[in-house]
Structure formats: structure tokens, C-alpha cells
């Protein structure tokens, strides 16, 4: 079981393993059936099966228990997850866990040679996230994060929810990736709290961390998660104002 933040290289590492051991490589997606899994167990072709558990709710993960507990001679299994939080305990108990260590800024710059500003390496801590950015898209996500942090206290509830329309839910490449947006909000909010001792920014920071953990599970409806996040941020900020 490979554990690490989105974009840290879990899929890349899986492909490297398959290549090094001369195994066929197959990713198992959400369309898999019990019949499919049985057929894989009967195959005589040495194959590395990669299961991204972020795409499966905990109840759905039950279908893999036999597959990972009783693999046949030609079956090799790598499970992937952003964290243990979204993995069924019975799956965890049947797995050998490997955690990807966090990258340093210097390692990221060596791995990802881009023209992005230095600040991008402070905010986004995995190669995959940085590779998904251009200078323009970095500015887009940072501007949106700054708008949330610095203007939420004057926004109406309806205006706060409008931010949800700027997020990419279905491969709309002119919009902002949800995970990148939450990373940027976390950075901007913490920086504002450290600089200005702003209690509202601290509450935005803490709320964002909680919702980042939910977003990392991957099997939630992103638009619903985003609306819940914006609602919560608006409420905590305006509660701070009313108590002031």
C-alpha cells in the first residue's frame, strides 16, 4: 500500500516497479466487477494490478479483500491512497504500508524544471501538482485563494458560494483544480495570520485543513464538498465578526 499526498508519484512508482520486474501493468478502475477480479486470479500472465483506493468508498473496498489476501502466483497488487483515513481497516491490516516522504523545496526544483515563481514551490509540495501548473494557472489559483481569504468578511453568503463556479469539476481546463485551490488558501490564510495576527485567517486556515483531508479521500462529490467548504468558511468568518 503506497501512501502519499496527491501528486507525490505513486502511479509513477507503480509503473517503475512493473517495468523493473517485467510485469504487465493494469490499473483497476471503478467499473471493476467480482467476475473481473476472479478472471485476474485465473490469469497466468505475471501482472501488476494497481488499485487507486481514492476512487473507491470504504464499502466498495470490501470487494478487494479476497483479491489482496489470496493472490495467485502471477498476481501482484499495489494499492494507492492519499492517506490511511479513506482506507478500510481490513484492507490496511492485509497490507504492507509504504509512506512517501515529503519533498523539500530543493528536491521539487530538481524534479520539476518550470518557470513557475518560487512561491509556487512553497505552496504546492508534490511534483504532480507543480507539473499541472503554468504561470497563468498559478496566478489564477493564487488570485482566487487571496480573494477568499481577504474578502470573505465582506461577502454575502450568496457571493461566497459563487467561488464554487470557478472550480474545475469535469475537466474544464480554464477553471481551478480543487486540491490546488485548497493548498493555496491554506498558504495564504496562514501567511495572513502570521503577518497580521488575523483571527479570521486562522479560522479559514483550520477549516481548510479539515476540508483538505476530506478532499484527499477522492471518492466524494467535489461540487458538494466545495459548497460545504465555502458555507463553513463564510459562517466561521462572520461568526468572528459578530463576536468582535
Ranges and model annotations:
Residues 1-28, 74, 82-244:
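Charged, glycine-rich active-site and insertion segments that engage polyanionic ligands
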Amino acid at each position: 500500500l503506497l501512501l502519499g499526498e496527491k501528486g507525490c508519484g505513486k502511479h509513477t512508482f507503480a509503473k517503475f516497479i512493473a517495468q523493473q520486474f517485467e510485469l504487465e501493468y493494469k490499473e483497476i478502475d471503478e467499473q471493476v466487477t467480482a467476475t473481473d477480479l476472479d478472471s485476474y486470479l485465473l490469469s497466468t500472465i505475471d501482472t501488476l494490478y494497481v488499485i487507486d483506493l481514492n476512487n473507491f468508498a470504504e464499502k466498495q473496498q470490501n470487494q478487494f479483500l479476497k483479491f489482496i489476501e489470496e493472490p495467485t502466483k502471477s498476481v501482484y497488487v499495489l494499492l494507492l491512497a492519499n492517506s490511511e483515513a479513506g482506507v478500510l481497516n481490513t484492507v490496511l491490516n492485509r497490507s504492507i504500508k509504504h509512506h512517501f516522504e515529503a519533498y523539500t523545496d530543493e528536491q521539487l526544483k530538481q524534479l520539476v524544471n518550470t518557470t513557475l515563481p518560487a512561491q509556487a514551490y512553497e505552496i504546492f509540495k508534490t511534483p504532480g501538482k507543480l507539473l499541472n501548473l503554468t504561470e497563468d494557472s498559478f496566478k489564477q489559483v493564487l488570485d482566487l485563494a487571496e480573494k477568499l481569504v481577504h474578502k470573505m468578511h465582506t461577502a454575502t453568503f450568496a457571493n461566497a458560494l459563487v467561488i464554487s463556479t470557478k472550480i474545475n469539476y469535469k475537466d474544464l481546463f480554464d477553471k481551478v483544480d480543487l486540491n490546488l485551490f485548497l493548498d493555496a488558501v491554506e498558504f495564504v490564510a496562514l501567511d495572513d495570520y502570521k503577518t497580521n495576527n488575523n483571527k479570521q485567517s486562522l479560522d479559514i486556515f483550520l477549516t481548510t485543513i479539515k476540508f483538505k483531508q476530506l478532499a484527499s479521500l477522492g471518492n466524494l462529490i467535489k461540487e458538494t464538498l466545495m459548497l460545504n467548504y465555502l458555507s463553513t468558511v463564510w459562517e466561521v468568518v462572520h461568526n468572528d465578526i459578530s463576536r468582535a
